[in-house]
Amino acid sequence: MPMDVILVLWFCVCTARTVLGFGMDPDLQMDIITELDLVNTTLGVTQVAGLHNASKAFLFQDVQREIHSAPHVSEKLIQLFRNKSEFTFLATVQQKPSTSGVILSIRELEHSYFELESSGPREEIRYHYIHGGKPRTEALPYRMADGQWHKVALSVSASHLLLHVDCNRIYERVIDPPETNLPPGSNLWLGQRNQKHGFFKGIIQDGKIIFMPNGFITQCPNLNRTCPTCSDFLSLVQGIMDLQELLAKMTAKLNYAETRLGQLENCHCEKTCQVSGLLYRDQDSWVDGDNCRNCTCKSGAVECRRMSCPPLNCSPDSLPVHISGQCCKVCRPKCIYGGKVLAEGQRILTKTCRECRGGVLVKITEACPPLNCSEKDHILPENQCCRVCRGHNFCAEAPKCGENSECKNWNTKATCECKNGYISVQGNSAYCEDIDECAAKMHYCHANTVCVNLPGLYRCDCIPGYIRVDDFSCTEHDDCGSGQHNCDKNAICTNTVQGHSCTCQPGYVGNGTVCKAFCEEGCRYGGTCVAPNKCVCPSGFTGSHCEKDIDECAEGFVECHNHSRCVNLPGWYHCECRSGFHDDGTYSLSGESCIDIDECALRTHTCWNDSACINLAGGFDCLCPSGPSCSGDCPHEGGLKHNGQVWILREDRCSVCSCKDGKIFCRRTACDCQNPNVDLFCCPECDTRVTSQCLDQSGQKLYRSGDNWTHSCQQCRCLEGEADCWPLACPSLSCEYTAIFEGECCPRCVSDPCLADNIAYDIRKTCLDSSGISRLSGAVWTMAGSPCTTCQCKNGRVCCSVDLVCLENN
């Protein structure tokens, strides 16, 4: 397709989406206040006057409440979010000054998939989301908890984040793309995080979620629109990558087909048969006289059929009978006596014993043996002249059955029955021939075997180069014995017809190709289950399940440079520069990169008039010669503070500063909990009210006002019954690739891009997958022949991982 046509189509798509974005399809938005039916909610919310009268506004009171979506609303929300990469949350809010609270939260159990929070104490807006199964937080410094009305709109387009406040673009960031496929059970909360945390105090109006590009236009129609959006661009890139993959696969299949055709054109293999040491070519026929069969070699297999005997047209004075050594019956004269017809060899008892021979009854002079039974038990067998006792063993007399048949006794006679694997040749089963199960296809030999007929049975022989699996199956190689298998070292290898199968040993899980040790209680914080119920913990954690963080600072494992101090982090630590020092940009782990700040050279000192600034390690001093100008006063915010003067900072009522000899010293307000007028905002530790306590995120522990704790990579503080949490401060890094290991909160430098969590993809650095297909950097695919293995190209490196849940289900 010509490039100009593509550009025209792209312009049409963008224009159409822009128009739709301005009009906002009602099917692609959710009015949260309407869906939650706040008009009929009485506990914790009250309808009040809003910024305008076009919609209802509600006051969220400082009481326990549960404002969340009904199941049908949650399901609607899940469907709207599914596979969406463009969405905007907007609302008009008036937040109580200096408070913290969650405006909107979409969560499932403890996982926040979308959460917008405003913190008054830290003066920032926070966006919480999930990426790659891990929580992420974007902290956007802005004071919204000031008691004034604000319009807020947070827009996400793939990895592009926009924050508008009062129709002004406040922040624009690149983030990790959030997970939008919400799991079943997800719930929407308004004005709180869950039942017990994050209560918003103030008024909310016009709460909506828009699932289209440029959703902020609904709130601020005069703002500029973006086309294409980040999501549009990424969709286009993904489409190109998909087409590239499809073309590569089709090329690979075509090359394989051409190779196979070339092999077939050059291949001619005649299949022969070998019987009793003789070699027969394909379609050769021969007579197996011993077994009365006609045999033919067909494609390497012997097919035999019993000879078809011609129909006998015996004369009226003869009967067809079997003659020893012949396959077909012949006509022999019959005998008639007293109306009874006798065939050749049959006997009849008259006054004497006679046998039919050549159409004549010949007298037999054999004497009958004496009987040792009563006369009532005497019986006359068929075609015999001598009586016998009932229960007589007819089979013990002269053999009548051939070697391949067995004699069976009956009341008055004995009959012959063919043994297993044989069939009658002469009709009465006295003469039996072997059944050729191979030729008759009555065998159970599987692939890679040759059926070999044996007297009364058959055998499945492996073709050359194959080994036996069982009585009926063979495999090409002894994969298990030779080590030519792909079973995990913790799997059991079994040879099969197709090659081999792998089964994980007890205590391990997987598909046999990959077997992972199974620990019933799991290994926390990135621990590895190395053997059944045995964890190996990563550095920084300990315990049988790696559940305990090691405080490297408190345990004395770390010795930071004297220009820095040790700060413990979950699973790690870092040396933070002390006051008066800053990092030189190399960010050494031990703090050696902390160097003195020269306040004199930078003119950040407070020395006044004729006093001279003298730089000191970690600070400065003011040296003034004697004279009237050496007052020791301090310049501050464009004014002057006198030597010895004490004051409270205008922007921080909890900090007290003093001027001494030209230098300003600031500290937190000293707290006297015995003073009934103590400021509880600055001295929360003096607040003993039960209502000022905070429940931690697990709902298991209470904290007093002023207490601090760490939870899920966030630093939390309880202030007058309100818990405010913000992301832990992490040290800066100067490396190309970083990774946050499981259980840790801060990134570390890694040299392998496969380990990197945050990576800038260079589309010039492509990868070749196992099938020879070229992949762009950032592309993700499933490994051929391994549906549970996912691979990604990271700047020229192929990085693959195995999904254990998938292995267990396949």
Curated annotation (Swiss-Prot):
PROSITE patterns tied to this protein: ASX_HYDROXYL, EGF_1, EGF_2, EGF_3, EGF_CA, LAM_G_DOMAIN, VWFC_1, VWFC_2
The organism's place on the tree of life at top rank:
Eukaryota
One GO BP annotation of this record: regulation of gene expression
Pfam families in the record: EGF_3, EGF_CA, Laminin_G_2, VWC
- Kindly list the cysteine pairs connected by disulfide bridges: 395-407, 401-416, 418-432, 438-451, 445-460, 462-474, 480-493, 487-502, 504-515, 519-529, 523-535, 537-546, 553-566, 560-575, 577-594, 600-613, 607-622, 624-630
| Compartments, record wording | Cytoplasm; Nucleus envelope; Secreted
Gene3D superfamilies found in the cross-reference section: 2.60.120.200, 6.20.200.20, Complement Module, domain 1, Laminin
Q: What is its main location?
A: cytoplasm
Name the glycosylated positions: 40, 53, 83, 224, 294, 372, 511, 562, 609, 708
Which segments constitute the Laminin G-like domain? 57-227
Which residues does Ca(2+) bind?
434-435, 437, 453-454, 457
Q: Which InterPro entries match?
A: ConA-like_dom_sf, EGF-like_Ca-bd_dom, EGF-like_dom, EGF-type_Asp/Asn_hydroxyl_site, EGF_Ca-bd_CS, EGF_dom, Growth_fac_rcpt_cys_sf, Laminin_G
* A GO cellular component annotation in the UniProt record: extracellular region
Span of domain VWFC: 271-332, 632-687, 692-750
Q: How does it assemble?
A: Homotrimer. Binds to PKC beta-1. Interacts with ATRAID; the interaction promotes osteoblast cell differentiation and mineralization. Interacts with ROBO3.
* Misc: It has been demonstrated that ROBO3 binds to both NELL1 and NELL2. However, NELL1 is not expressed in the spinal cord at the time of commissural axon growth to the midline and has no significant effect on commissural axon repulsion in vitro, suggesting that NELL1 is not a functional ligand for ROBO3 in commissural axons. It remains possible, however, that NELL1 functions as a ligand for ROBO3 at another spatiotemporal location.
User: Its biological function?
Assistant: Plays a role in the control of cell growth and differentiation. Promotes osteoblast cell differentiation and terminal mineralization.
Protein name per Swiss-Prot or TrEMBL: Protein kinase C-binding protein NELL1
